[in-house]
Structures are given as structure tokens and as C-alpha cells.
Curated annotation (Swiss-Prot):
GO cellular component, one term: cytoplasm
UniProt entry keywords in alphabetical sequence: Cytoplasm, Glycosyltransferase, Iron, Metal-binding, Plasmid, Transferase
Note on cofactor: Binds 1 Fe(3+) cation per subunit.
Record-given protein name: Autotransproter heptosyltransferase BAHTCr
Enzyme type, top EC level: transferase
Record: residues binding Fe(3+): C339, C342, C358, C370
Disruption-associated phenotype: Severely reduces bacterial colonization of the gastrointestinal tract of orally infected C57BL/6 mice.
Its EC number(s): 2.4.99.-
Compartments, as annotated in UniProt: Cytoplasm
Top-level taxon of origin: Bacteria
Active site: D110
Source species: Citrobacter rodentium (strain ICC168) (Citrobacter freundii biotype 4280)
Keyword Transcription appears in the UniProt entry: no
Subunit architecture: Homododecamer composed of 6 homodimers forming a ring.
Length: 409
């Protein structure tokens, strides 16, 4: 069963959308762009904040574009050759302008991690912002952000934006689409750097108004992911965790989309003893279920981000990414005694087509040891401390409605 990895960005308009004097066209839809008619021109692209000249040239006609595509407060100057005063002098100003932020589609965790930076961007610049993303995520977020226009990449509403920014994961040491490699700052925080806003993380806003429909205390788990490196590859880990949760009095609900997932000869299955709540449900239904869970246990994947946004504690198990690669949770489970952190290694490039990607130890007995060495005992120890923290509050509601994720150990 192959998951869809459909993902694409909105391309810039074929010609710049802004009209300057003497038929000069310009915009900021792929960095700074200038299209010049026949003439003798001198063009400068500057960083307006530092005053540094980033590029200058003499040109008779054609295009001048910046190499940097992320947010820079560009200043475009176009002179007639030999003249001291610019004919066009435009400094990027997004206030009351049509701006597009293009996100990839099909990546729940990425979008939930990135989107708060788009809201921060709109609030800072007071622009007319449109964001493109997958429809199921639009359905989840749009009611909470009325000041932002949402659309799918196939049907953008803004056809002539003043500026466009493309938030995504850029590999291979790319510093034209991102000012700092996402693997050095955490993939979600890279959106803050691309958009030029405060990179501190924040959860998305969600509709948390649904009532609790399950009387017993319960914990939600999600065990599936998009590649084997993201799984918890300890053979008995999940079985030990489910048994421990039941001994503490919790129902254990598995809320993955698929009960079984894999490729080729490697398949992963719903843990024995967990209740099967799997299926392709609207994201809001998952929110309704998570909101009243005592806590959530999962991987470095989208449902962990969704659980975090509902405000419940998240036990996050990961080894292929470093502890600061995702949102902060005091209940992070990481084992430093083996190979780890390949996702965040800037000398490596993740291979999306290799389901068994393990760049340092593939086809050896050390393959996936980053999570294989995370034992059920280690995870159950974190669960026991979290459970004790909930019990210590002396509020029975904490067991059924959860508690804020920022509580310490």
C-alpha cells in the first residue's frame, strides 16, 4: 500500500504582477524580480535592512532576479544608465498587499508545525494573506483563522500576488530557499526563518469544543509512519506499553489511519491489545477524540503534532530525529547510546523513495538501532512518571480530559 506523496508549490506568475514607470514590471513572487523593456538600464537589488547591495548589473532588456527566495526586505532600484536618480525605487512593503504562502500538500505534521508562522507573518505585515495546502488540513484550520484565505494548490484565489513565499523542506545544503538549513534549527522552526518571523514554536488553534463521549480514562496511541526509520523498531515495545497502560487503568485506543502499513516485505501492525480506532476519518474527529484523552503516545509524525495542539501531554518516541527537531515535550523518549539523528545530519539527504532508509547502518545488524534501543521499560518509565504527575494533581478530570503539555517531569 503506497501512501500518496503528492506535493507541489505554486509557481510564480509568468510575468511580474506590478507595473512601474516606462513599462518596467516587478514583483516579489520568486524573490525580487524585474522584467525590463528595451533600453539601457542599471539595476540594483539591495537588502533594505542592511543597505547592502546584493546584485547590480547593466542590462538592455530582460530579467533580473534575486538568488534568495525566502523573505528579505528587498529594495529594487532601476536607473537609466548614466543617471543618478532611480526611475524605479521600490522597497518591499506587504501592508494591505496580496501575499501567497505556498505549502506542500499531504504532510500533516509539517503543516501543523509550519502554519503558526504564517499567522505570525500575517499579523506582523497586515497583508491580505492566502495559504495553499491540502483540503483536509484546510477543513481543520480555516474556521480558526478567519483573517487568512485558504485554498488548494489547484485552485488558488490570488492570481496576481505582490509576493509569494514557499515553505518546505530544502535538502542538499540549499540556502537560496531557506536562510538556514532546516536540519540545524528543527524543521518546523525553519518556517519562521523562511518567513522572517519569530522562530519560536507554537501549536495551531483548533476547535476543542466537542464533549467527551468515552466514560473511562483512555490513552491514544499512533504507531504508523511514512518510513521505517520513523517507527519504534523495538520488537516488543508496543506490547509492553499497551499492557502497562492497561495495568494503570487506561483504555488504549490506536488512532492511526491504517491498522497495517508497510512496503515490500516489511509491514507494521496495530499493537496487540490496543482497541482499533484506525481509519480515514476527518481530522476534526481525531481532535475530538484526542482532546479528552489523558495523554498521547506516538512517533515523530503528524498525529503527535495534532495531539500537542489539543493541549494534552505527548509522549514522543523518536531516534532518527534529535530531541529538538520537533516541538518540546517533557515526555520525549530518546536513547543516546546508539546511532541517532540521521534526519538532522546535514551531510545526509533523506531518500523519500527508500522505505528502509538507514544511511549509516542499512543491511547490518545495527539498522534502526536509534529506536530499537528504546526499550519498553524506558517508555513505560516515562508513562509511569506522567501518570503519577496526573494523579498528584488530585483532579479526576485530569485522567479523562488531559492536562497541559508543558508540565515538567
Amino acid at each position: 500500500m503506497q501512501k500518496s506523496l503528492a506535493t507541489f508549490f505554486i509557481s510564480p506568475p509568468e510575468i511580474p504582477t506590478q507595473h512601474g514607470p516606462d513599462n518596467i514590471l516587478y514583483d516579489f513572487n520568486d524573490g525580487a524580480r524585474v522584467l525590463l523593456p528595451e533600453g539601457k538600464w542599471h539595476v540594483r537589488l539591495l537588502d533594505a535592512d542592511s543597505g547592502n547591495i546584493l546584485f547590480c548589473c547593466d542590462i538592455n532588456n530582460g530579467w533580473v532576479t534575486s538568488s534568495k527566495k525566502y523573505f528579505v526586505r528587498f529594495r529594487i532600484q532601476v536607473f537609466r544608465q548614466g543617471e543618478d536618480s532611480p526611475l524605479l525605487d521600490e522597497t518591499l512593503n506587504l501592508t494591505d498587499r496580496d501575499v501567497l504562502i505556498s505549502f506542500p500538500t499531504g504532510t500533516l505534521g509539517d503543516l501543523l508545525g509550519w502554519f503558526p508562522y504564517a499567522e505570525r507573518f500575517q499579523s506582523l505585515h497586515q497583508c491580505r494573506l492566502e495559504c495553499t495546502m491540502a483540503q483536509d488540513i484546510i477543513d481543520l484550520l480555516a474556521p480558526q483563522y478567519p483573517q487568512i484565505c485558504f485554498s488548494t494548490p489547484e485552485k488558488p484565489r490570488t492570481t496576481e500576488p505582490y509576493a509569494t513565499y514557499r515553505v518546505g523542506l530544502y535538502f542538499g545544503g540549499d540556502t537560496n530557499n531557506q536562510p538556514v538549513d532546516f536540519r540545524q534549527v528543527g524543521f518546523h522552526r525553519s518556517a519562521g526563518y523562511i518567513l522572517g518571523v519569530d522562530p519560536r514554536e507554537a501549536p495551531v488553534r483548533l476547535n476543542l469544543s466537542a464533549p467527551c463521549t468515552i466514560r473511562e480514562p483512555y490513552v491514544c496511541i499512533a504507531t504508523q509512519s511514512t518510513c521505517q526509520a520513523k517507527y519504534w523498531n523495538n520488537g516488543t515495545g508496543w506490547s509492553e506499553v499497551v499492557a502497562h497502560l492497561k495495568s494503570l487503568g487506561y483504555r488504549v485506543l490506536c488512532i492511526d489511519r491504517e491498522a497495517h502499513y508497510g512496503q515490500g516485505f516489511v509491514w507494521n501492525h496495530i499493537p496487540w491489545g490496543a482497541e482499533d480506532f484506525t481509519g480515514s476519518f476527518p481530522l476534526q474527529e481525531r481532535v475530538n477524540l484526542l482532546r479528552h484523552a489523558s495523554f498521547f503516545i506516538g512517533l515523530a509524525s503528524g498525529l503527535s503534532w495534532l495531539a500537542w495542539a489539543t493541549g494534552i501531554p505527548v509522549v514522543l518516541i523518536s531516534g532518527f530525529s534529535l530531541p529538538d527537531s520537533e516541538f518540546y515535550t517533557p515526555w520525549r523518549v530518546f536513547n543516546s547510546h546508539g546511532c541517532n539523528g540521521c534526519w538532522d545530519d546535514t551531510s545526509l539527504n533523506f531518500d523519500h523513495k527508500d522505505f528502509l532508509w538507514c544511511p549509516r547502518h542499512k543491511n547490518t545488524d545495527r539498522q534502526f538501532e536509534c529506536t530499537r534501543l528504546i526499550t519498553g521499560t524506558q517508555v513505560n518509565g516515562v508513562i509511569s512518571r506522567l501518570h503519577a504527575s496526573l494523579m498528584k494533581q488530585g483532579d479526576k478530570a485530569c485522567l479523562t480530559k488531559g492536562t497541559n503539555n508543558e508540565q515538567g517531569l
